[in-house]
């Protein structure tokens, strides 16, 4: 009898706990509904974060959020406690230094060696301190100096040789330029991180580097599953390993880590690299030697973060730049005419100072940045205080992010927003340029603007100038489109960009 009573009592407690849990869920959901009832958005987004996560898993989150903005307006609730904005004033306030809004927990996905690089630093003051250590290194006046620019120019010429070899091999003048661009961006990034003496040699034929880069792109396609469903991702990894009898398919991130640590050891063990070369490793080592309390883990995390971000951003941006010029022969010819008028340095490439001021090239690249942003747009911030943007009140601790796609395609700012039209930049008055630039955030905005912007522009403009000084390009299939996945680095679907090359006459 006591046993029966005990079982009955335990069952009653279990039922009560279940009911209390359900009641808590109902109360919390009701509170959230009431708290954000004034912010429009899909009904499913109001009650669960799983709806927007579904589009994340489908690699369509940024595109879907931009679609919701077209439907609901500049403020959209995309999940309980999460709001997306496409209002320019609100965006600038959200990311301003004065707001001091920390980054969200999403950036915990970018921890390396249990340390936070600048990109993953959530708190405003922590980010400001770390950024202050290296910001001068990334300034245009620094990266445009000969010791960084000349090795990059040499790699431009190496990339052109690769393209020529592929043209001959194909027999039809068709080349997939994306892997070549990726190798070029990787070699440039590793040179900036470790110094030219210890950079990678993907352009020169290092198959290990090339294989690693290809696997990193495939690995990123699974990023949303890894971040949102880690147990499922572990199961998929195990199943693939058993089926293929190899762990190589999902080992790219671990292999990159090992590669980076080996290269770090070689760099720090080489007295010449610490004395004669400017690099991120050399900079941080110098700070440590002068008393800055920077741990080994921080140095390692900064290295890996720069390797990921540097090569991925330039690969996507440059691939889309040549894609748009190939798809728009009129603007390609305008760029070529402009390039023909520029003086050349000893290596045959245009003088950088004048190239960087070439207005038509600048306008074309800006249009490419606008139409195809180089990142996912998940620049999430946690509101440090209750905030009001016009008539919209958003409470403290809400996760807020700006939709880059929605801002870049806003028909109230951009006439025929989906059209590649560099003329909008070339014919605009100074006041109109300022108005366009307020809605133009390819490298972010505010206190956390991308540090590598100047180095990225150097790589992109030099590569474009080299191609179109010598060749005409067209799409392999005329009129084809090259859409983007909604991955962290906004990779092109298919991971390729096949162009038809023809030597200029």
From Swiss-Prot:
Q: Which InterPro entries match?
A: Cyt_P450, Cyt_P450_CS, Cyt_P450_E_grp-I, Cyt_P450_sf, Cytochrome_P450_monoxygenase
Q: What induces it?
A: Expression is positively regulated by the cluster-specific transcription factor FGM4 and is induced during infection of coleoptiles of wheat seedlings. The fusaoctaxin A gene cluster is silenced by H3K27 trimethylation by the histone methyltransferase KMT6.
User: According to the UniProt entry, what is the EC number of this protein?
Assistant: 1.-.-.-
Where do the annotations place heme binding?
450
What broad class of enzyme is this? oxidoreductase
- Cofactor requirements of the protein: heme
Recite the UniProt keywords alphabetically.
Glycoprotein, Heme, Iron, Metal-binding, Monooxygenase, Oxidoreductase, Signal
Signal peptide range in chain numbering: 1-23
Query: Between which residues do disulfide bridges form?
Result: none
Q: Please report a single Pfam family linked to this protein.
A: p450
Its UniProt pathway annotation is: Secondary metabolite biosynthesis
**Record-linked SUPFAM superfamilies:** Cytochrome P450
An example of a GO molecular function for this protein is: oxidoreductase activity, acting on paired donors, with incorporation or reduction of molecular oxygen
Disrupted gene: phenotype observed: Produces significantly smaller lesions and fewer spikelets with blight symptoms on susceptible wheat cultivars.
Q: What is the annotated role of this protein in its UniProt record?
A: Cytochrome P450 monooxygenase; part of the Fg3_54/C64 gene cluster that mediates the biosynthesis of the octapeptide fusaoctaxin A, a virulence factor that is required for cell-to-cell invasiveness of plant host. The 2 nonribosomal peptide synthetases NRPS9 and NRPS5 form an assembly line which likely utilizes GABA as a starter unit (loaded on the unique module M1 of NRPS9) and sequentially incorporates seven extender units composed of the residues L-Ala, L-allo-Ile, L-Ser, L-Val, L-Ser, L-Leu and L-Leu, respectively.
Give the UniProt family note.
Belongs to the cytochrome P450 family.
Q: Spell out the protein name for this chain.
A: Cytochrome P450 monooxygenase FGM1
From which source organism is this entry?
A: Gibberella zeae (strain ATCC MYA-4620 / CBS 123657 / FGSC 9075 / NRRL 31084 / PH-1)
Provide the organism lineage as a comma list: Eukaryota, Fungi, Dikarya, Ascomycota, Pezizomycotina
Which gene name does the record give?
Answer: FGM1
């Amino acid at each position: 009898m006591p046993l029966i009573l005990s079982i009955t009592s335990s069952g009653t407690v279990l039922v009560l706990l279940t009911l209390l849990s359900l009641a808590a869920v109902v109360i919390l959901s009701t509170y959230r509904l009431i708290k954000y009832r004034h912010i429009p958005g899909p009904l499913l987004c109001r009650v669960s974060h799983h709806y927007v996560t579904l589009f994340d898993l489908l690699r369509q989150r940024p595109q879907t959020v931009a679609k919701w903005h077209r439907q609901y307006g500049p403020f959209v609730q995309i999940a309980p406690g999460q709001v997306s904005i496409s209002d320019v004033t609100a965006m600038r306030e959200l990311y301003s230094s004065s707001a001091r809004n920390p980054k969200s927990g999403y950036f915990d996905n970018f921890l390396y060696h249990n340390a936070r690089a600048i990109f993953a630093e959530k708190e405003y003051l922590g980010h400001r301190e770390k950024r202050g250590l290296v910001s001068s290194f990334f300034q245009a006046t620094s990266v445009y100096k000969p010791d960084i620019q000349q090795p990059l120019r040499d790699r431009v010429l190496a990339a052109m040789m690769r393209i020529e070899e592929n043209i001959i091999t194909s027999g039809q003048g068709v080349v997939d330029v994306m892997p070549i661009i990726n190798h070029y961006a990787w070699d440039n990034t590793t040179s900036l991180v470790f110094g030219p003496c210890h950079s990678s040699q993907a352009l020169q034929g290092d198959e290990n580097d090339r294989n690693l880069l290809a696997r990193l792109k495939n690995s990123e396609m699974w990023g949303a599953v890894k971040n949102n469903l880690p147990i499922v991702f572990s199961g998929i990894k195990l199943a693939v390993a058993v089926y293929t009898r190899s762990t190589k398919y999902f080992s790219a991130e671990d292999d990159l880590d090992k590669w980076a640590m080996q290269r770090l050891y070689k760099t720090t063990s080489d007295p010449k690299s610490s004395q004669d070369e400017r690099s991120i490793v050399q900079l941080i080592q110098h700070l440590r030697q002068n008393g800055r309390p920077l741990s080994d883990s921080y140095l390692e995390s900064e290295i890996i973060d720069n390797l990921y971000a540097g090569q991925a951003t330039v690969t996507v941006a440059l691939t889309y730049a040549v894609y748009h010029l190939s798809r728009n022969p009129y603007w390609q010819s305008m760029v070529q005419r402009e390039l023909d008028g520029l003086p050349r340095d000893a290596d045959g490439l245009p003088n950088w100072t004048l190239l960087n001021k070439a207005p038509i090239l600048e306008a074309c690249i800006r249009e490419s940045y606008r139409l195809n942003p180089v990142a996912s747009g998940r620049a999430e911030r946690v509101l440090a205080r209750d905030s009001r943007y016009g008539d919209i009140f958003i409470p403290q601790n809400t996760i807020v992010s700006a939709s880059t796609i929605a801002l870049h395609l806003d028909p109230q700012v951009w006439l025929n927003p989906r059209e590649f039209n560099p003329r909008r930049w070339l014919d605009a008055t100074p006041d109109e340029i300022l108005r366009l630039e307020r809605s133009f955030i390819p490298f972010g905005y505010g206190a956390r603007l991308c540090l590598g912007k100047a180095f990225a522009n150097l790589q992109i403009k030099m590569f474009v100038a080299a191609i179109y000084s010598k060749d005409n390009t067209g799409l392999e299939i005329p009129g084809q489109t090259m859409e983007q996945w909604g991955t962290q680095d906004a990779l092109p679907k298919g991971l390729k960009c096949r162009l038809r090359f023809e030597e200029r006459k």
